[in-house]
Amino acid sequence: MKIFNILPLSLILAGFSAFAQSTNSSPVDLVNPLMGSDSNYSLSNGNTYPAIALPWGMNFWTPQTAKMGDGWIYAYDATKIQGIKQTHQPSPWIGDYGQFSLFATTDGLKIDGEKRASWFSHKSETAKPYYYSVYLADYDVTAEITPTERASIFRFTFPENKKSYLLIDAFDKGSYIKIIKEENKIIGYSTKNSEGVAPNFKNFFVVQLDKPFAEGEVWSDTSIVKNIIELKAGHVGAALRFETKRGDVVHARVASSFISIEQAELNLKELGNDTFDQVCQKGRAIWNKGLSCIEVEGGSSDQLRTFYSCLYRTMLFPRKFFEVDATGKIMHYSPYEGKIMPGYLFTDNGYWDTFRAVFPLFNLMHPSLNAKIQEGMVNTFNESGWLPEWASPGHRDCMIGSNSASIIADAYLKGARGYDINKLYEAVLKNSEQAGPLESVGRAGVSYYNRLGYIPYDVKINESAARTLEYAYDDWTILQLAKALNRPQKELDLFTKRCQNYRNLFDKETRLMRGKNEDGTFQKPFNPFKWGDAFTEGNSWHYTWSVFHDVQGLADLMGGRKEFAKMLDSVFVVPPIFDASYYRKVIHEIREMQIANMGNYAHGNQPIQHMIYLYNYAAEPWKAQYWVRETMNRMYNPAPDGYCGDEDNGQTSAWYIFSAIGFYDVCPGSDQYILGAPLFKKITLNLENGKKVVIEAPENSAEKRYIQEMTFNGKPYTKNWLSHSALMKGATLTFKMGAKPNKERGTKEEDLPYSFSKVKKQENR
């Protein structure tokens, strides 16, 4: 029985042949996996590493330039490399788990990571999504890797040397290694993690070599342990010695499993009998097929490279945390229960970031994937009792909100099916009523929120205003899901009331959101430029706009649309001043806003990323068109410093993808995308259902960024929004672009997007 079915190469290639013909380039060739890797603790230009993987693969591989345990695994400005590491790290702030590495040396045996590290140069390094190669200058060795979802092949090319070593490092915090010399094989496991796992967590691995080695030894910490071939200790590894002639190649076929060594052996069958080059070409074809879901024409080389580098980033997380047993059954190790369970599981994702654009992009371009993710969320709830607001691989105490409600509602309302939606509704109801075992699970401060309509500033629950605003939006998404599921009127009334709780924090004096005490008075003193405190990684200027579902209601509080537009303008006008006293230091998010020179607009972090599109609600869409293009031009480039803050599991990249297409999902849970303007002359969305959305803007240029006219399927279209359901039927959108804004288009009441308050007023007439 074949367990892993791989499409014939000809079929995979067919998916992107049209793209190749129109651009004379394959999309994967435009991807720079090093984009965002020039980052450090103090300043993030993405905080990424080159993830050598297949789309949403269980394992990533990356060159390791940092010492063991350092969250900045790969830094572009580093000069030495000490291993090629299997990683599952979603963020340097979250950390890694189950990691181990392979490396090659010559001459004297060096075990310690920093001592064995070799000089390398980017001039002798190649990074593609499906392939990585580096020349290890100190050892005259070329190391290469190409992956499948759960396995990979290494190719090491050695010089002439009687002491050519292959090192397998199982890392510290508890590991195991065994050399099976007669089979040219090494097995082992790593228990290293950054929390979020059950006590019995292990990542089992198998390394199968294609030729015998002269000698094999195991080590503990930094010392060889003589006369044994099997070792379990804090930090173990294996050193395999080969006697090589110049040009000799050693292949290592590697696979891992969170279930067992036997399952790792089974996962190794993903490679089949393919050679290194065949696996590499199949990986290339898979990436080309995936990236060709969106075809773009026109634009500069940098714009094309930025677009596909960003699209690559949206196709990494959340990772598949499931495996396939010998009968073809889907199963997973539960990081919550420590048991082997049936069904899908996905992990390494922070919903505070990704509910905004990543999951809406899935609903548009990858709905069947998102249905599996929803099934995985059912499994998480069944196994842990909670939804995974930040999972890596299990629950992590990071960020705020209960934004799983948004992800669940948006998926179901946009057509995802095939999983237990009633179980997920039960889960979001539980979230709305209970605080969880971690602040990021359930709702911290929920008893105050449900009783008072806000979380008080003075009850020692940090980031109280941010939590209140996000809970109110999440309650609106629960309301929409409840309507779709025909829930009792009592529930509809409850969430209709709660979704308006944002109003309780609006300060008419400053026209900003402000922390409020339990007695109903506003916090004093109040500095709208103060980061943290009542807000999360931002200030009041950033969080005031977090009323995704009722922008008109927010505008009414500010005195109407004109005053609302003036407040939006002010974000770019006020200088990038800040108060960092809450953190007692200038955190990297503050520094990234400061150096961007866009006023107090902080695109490098998520809370304000939708703000530009709110001009459409104020009947001034041309300002959105200006600032969206400005942000794409200034905050992104396809280089190691290519982002303006943390990339965050695809979120900052997904903003660029949507914005380049010409619209953005301001309010997941609604049916509407809000218009910006397309970046390219032509964009084709190849929808999963076989339909196409063709977006044409033939006059598009650096100067012509403003929409003059627009047609939808050949008919004049003046609205500032597009319907998801209409796009899913296939559509042609044609934009006439110009150098000056058209201040008449998109200004009528019927042109403005959905807001909860508008609908309520219409219902009450």
Name the predicted role of every residue range.
Residues 1-23, 765:
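Bacterial Sec-dependent N-terminal signal peptides
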Residues 21-359, 363-406, 412-469, 477, ...:
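Accessory carbohydrate-recognition regions in carbohydrate-active enzymes
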Residues 474:
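ATP-dependent phospho-/nucleotidyl transfer catalytic cores
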Residues 706:
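Extracellular attachment/recognition segments
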